[in-house]
Every structure is written in structure tokens, then in C-alpha cells.
């Protein structure tokens, strides 16, 4: 299977050089980027007036939570979770979760996301949807034991069951990740066991860390230290760890994260909507910490649009620092692409020969994207997910000219309405 993308503005290489060129894909790899490629291909896409971008990597989300979009807004995190989200989640079944996963996959494909790091329940169902959709998914079961040894064993067993299920799919696109929810919902015993199992099985770990001041206070009262210091003291960190949020980090925390090569997944929309705080982006970057970008779940965003998320990230840190030079467009674009891919150990996030063919084509033939003075600026500050015309993952076209090839959009939307009616 080969694809030839012609006449586009290509965001090329590590330096994000924008060139007018063609892109040739064979199997699941980019094999050539050059002007006027004169070779036959199974599929030819005319990208005139369009931008050929690396697909976006959503480094933290809860994809089935689109079911809860708009059900509870304008609340602090713990009120939102305890009074609204957790009671609804207690009613979830595998079928309901699968419907939510379809809705999330549909939204991601239509907005140019090609890879996502997920944490939720019934992750075997999410894995089935990911496989069918054509997306690249890194899937974690959210482990919570609340200090109960019986729950610790149960959560570990469920995670291992999901791992075995995902490995049984034998897909290069669908991967298992260990996902202890957070230091305030997981015992030290569970966190240590996750670290041991990740070493044994060679898996990544993702965990919520230092999202709110309430969490900082709770962990400080319980252990006498910050969540980051706590995790460091038990030997939890490594280059295979991706922490979500990292809002409330002091200088010592940042030094620890940098020393261990931990990645932080920044979720600006969710952090602003829940008034959790502003993560110290510039200090993290200055320390050499890899920072990716995530949307969090749709219930606290309220979408999975990575183009939208880039703009919010850029604007948030400029106004917070009273400095228009921070979080510049190129920095934020890297966070949404290559930085996320790097965290996952994925040779993607860059359009270059030898890299995986995970690509989004964005239609710039629109008034809000003309004139084309600066492609990266337009992608960060002007574009949105509805401007994505074509999405390619692993060398397979999932959407072309806004037409979907792997999912039934009408059925997914109808099922979502039915399920939320039954849940509420």
C-alpha cells in the first residue's frame, strides 16, 4: 500500500521547516519528501493549498469520557469528581464505555490526532475500538486501591488481565501502559508493585501528579513531602514515566523530574476549566524536561481538539508570565507532536524519511488561514480541528476529504445519545 501526497506545504523534519513538496508513503513509513515526486502510488492525494503536518499526539486523555461532556461544569476538581463524575462512572458497563470510546476515537480522527495515551476503565473495550478505528493507542487501566490491600491485589490483577488482552491483539498500534491513578488514590504498596511490573514487562507508566493544591496538601499531610518527592523516594521514576498535569511543582520537584528523564503531559484547558492552576512550563523546559500536550477527558475540556489545545497552551503561559515570548508557536507545536512521540518511544511526530506515516492534512483554503504568512503560527493560533481534512495513521487513510473510512459516524452519535439517556 502506497500513498503519494502532492503539492502541499509540508512541515518537514526536526526544525519544522515548511517546504512546498510531495510526500511518498510506502507501507507504514514515510520514504521520500521532495518536490515533484514522479512515482506511481495506490492513492494520490492533492494537497494544494493545504498543510501536511505530523499527526498530533494527545499525551493525556480519558477518551470514553465524552459521554459526560457538559454534564457537570464550573466546579472545583474534587467536587466535580466526587459529586458528579465518579457516581456516573459507577454505573458504567463495558458496553457503555465502548460507546464512549467510539465517540472519542471519532473526535480524534476528525481533528487530526493520530496517537493518544489513555487512562480509564474497561480498557479491553477501548483496545477493541482503537484497533478498529485505526488510531495508535497507548492504553492504561486506571488503578485505584485507596490503601486497601484487597483492592491492591484486585487492581494489579485487572491491569495484568488488560495487558494480556492487549498483547493478544498482536497490534503494533495498540499498546498497554500501567496507569496507577495518582499518589492520593494509590497506596505505596501499589505504586511499588507497578514500578516492579513495569520493569518486568517493559511497559510505560502514566500517573496523575501534582494537579491541584488540594492534592499537595493531602500528600504533604499524609507523608510530609510533595507527591514528586514521595514518588522519587520509593524509586518510582524513570524515562518510562509520563506524569499528567504537574501543575504544582517546586524547584526540587523539577530537578527530580529532569534527573530521571520523566515526561510531563500538560493539560492547559482542563487545568484552566477546573481552576487547578498553571504548570511551570518555562521552568520545566529550561530544566530540560520533556513536556507533551494532552486534552484530559472531554468532560473537563470539553473536547479532544489538539489544535485548540495548542492555542490555549500558548496563550495561557504568555498571560501568566506577562511575557509574550514564552510558549511560542514552535515550542507548543513540538509539545503536540514530537515531544509526545518521544515520551512514548515512538518514531513519529516528525515528517521525515524513515518515520512512521502518521499525518494530518489541514485545509488552509479558508479565510481564517489566509494569507499563508506563517504555517506554524496559523496551526497554533488560527486553525481548529474542523480544518483537518485528512488523517493518516500507520500509512492507512482513516479520513480523506472529511470522509471516514473506519468508523460509522451516524451510529456512534446515535449510540452516544442513547447511552447517556440510560446513564442519567
From Swiss-Prot:
Entry-linked Pfam families: Amidohydro_1
A molecular-function term among this protein's GO annotations: 5'-methylthioadenosine deaminase activity
Gene3D superfamilies (alphabetical): Metal-dependent hydrolases, Urease, subunit C, domain 1
Record's cofactor remark: Binds 1 zinc ion per subunit.
Binding site for substrate: 89, 181, 211, 296
Keyword entries, A-Z: Hydrolase, Metal-binding, Zinc
EC main group: hydrolase
Residues engaged in binding Zn(2+): 60, 62, 208, 296
Cofactor requirements of the protein: Zn(2+)
EC number(s) stated in the UniProt entry for this protein: 3.5.4.28, 3.5.4.31
Reactions catalysed, as given in the entry: S-adenosyl-L-homocysteine + H2O + H(+) = S-inosyl-L-homocysteine + NH4(+); S-methyl-5'-thioadenosine + H2O + H(+) = S-methyl-5'-thioinosine + NH4(+)
UniProt entry tagged with the keyword Hydrolase: yes
Family statement: Belongs to the metallo-dependent hydrolases superfamily. MTA/SAH deaminase family.
Function of the protein: Catalyzes the deamination of 5-methylthioadenosine and S-adenosyl-L-homocysteine into 5-methylthioinosine and S-inosyl-L-homocysteine, respectively. Is also able to deaminate adenosine.
UniProt cross-references to NCBIfam families, sorted A to Z: PRK08393.1
Protein's recorded name: 5-methylthioadenosine/S-adenosylhomocysteine deaminase
Amino acid at each position: 500500500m502506497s500513498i503519494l501526497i502532492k503539492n502541499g506545504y509540508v512541515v518537514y523534519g526536526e526544525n519544522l521547516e515548511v517546504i512546498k513538496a510531495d510526500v511518498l508513503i510506502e507501507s507504514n513509513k514515510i520514504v521520500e519528501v521532495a518536490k515533484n515526486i514522479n512515482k506511481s502510488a495506490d492513492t494520490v492525494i492533492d494537497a494544494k493549498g493545504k498543510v501536511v503536518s505530523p499527526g498530533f499526539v494527545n499525551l493525556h486523555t480519558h477518551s470514553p469520557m465524552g459521554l459526560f461532556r457538559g454534564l457537570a461544569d464550573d466546579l472545583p476538581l474534587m467536587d466535580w469528581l466526587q459529586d458528579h463524575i465518579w457516581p456516573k462512572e459507577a454505573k458504567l458497563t463495558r458496553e457503555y464505555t465502548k460507546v464512549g470510546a467510539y465517540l472519542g476515537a471519532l473526535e480524534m480522527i476528525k481533528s487530526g490526532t493520530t496517537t493518544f495515551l489513555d487512562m480509564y476503565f474497561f480498557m479491553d473495550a477501548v483496545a477493541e475500538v482503537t484497533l478498529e478505528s485505526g488510531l495508535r493507542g497507548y492504553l492504561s487501566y486506571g488503578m485505584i486501591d485507596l490503601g486497601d490491600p484487597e483492592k491492591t491485589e484486585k487492581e494489579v490483577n485487572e491491569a495484568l488481565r488488560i495487558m494480556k488482552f492487549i498483547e493478544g491483539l498482536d497490534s503494533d498500534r495498540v499498546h498497554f501502559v500501567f496507569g496507577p491513578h495518582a499518589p492520593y488514590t494509590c497506596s505505596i504498596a501499589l505504586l511499588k508493585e507497578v514500578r516492579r511490573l513495569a520493569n518486568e514487562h517493559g511497559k510505560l507508566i502514566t500517573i496523575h501528579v501534582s494537579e491541584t493544591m488540594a492534592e499537595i496538601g493531602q500528600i504533604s499531610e499524609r507523608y510530609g513531602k510533595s507527591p514528586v518527592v514521595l514518588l522519587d523516594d520509593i524509586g518510582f521514576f524513570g524515562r518510562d514515566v509520563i506524569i499528567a498535569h504537574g501543575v504544582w511543582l517546586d524547584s526540587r520537584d523539577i530537578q527530580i523530574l529532569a534527573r530521571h528523564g520523566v515526561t510531563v503531559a500538560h493539560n492547559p484547558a482542563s487545568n484552566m476549566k477546573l481552576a487547578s492552576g498553571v504548570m511551570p512550563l518555562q521552568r520545566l523546559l529550561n530544566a530540560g524536561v520533556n513536556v507533551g500536550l494532552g486534552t484530559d477527558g472531554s468532560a473537563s475540556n470539553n473536547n479532544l481538539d489538539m489544535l485548540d489545545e495548542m492555542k490555549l497552551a500558548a496563550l495561557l503561559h504568555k498571560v501568566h508570565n506577562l511575557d509574550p515570548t514564552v510558549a511560542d508557536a514552535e515550542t507548543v507545536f513540538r509539545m503536540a507532536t514530537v515531544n509526545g512521540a518521544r515520551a512514548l518511544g515512538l518514531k513519529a511526530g516528525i515528517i521525515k524519511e524513515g518515520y512512521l506515516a502518521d499525518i494530518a492534512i489541514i485545509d488552509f483554503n479558508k479565510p481564517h488561514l489566509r494569507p499563508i504568512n506563517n504555517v506554524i503560527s496559523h496551526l497554533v493560533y488560527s486553525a481548529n480541528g474542523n480544518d483537518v481534512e485528512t488523517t493518516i495513521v500507520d500509512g492507512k487513510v482513516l479520513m480523506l476529504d472529511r470522509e471516514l473510512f473506519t468508523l460509522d459516524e451516524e451510529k456512534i452519535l446515535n449510540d452516544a445519545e442513547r447511552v447517556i439517556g440510560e446513564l442519567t
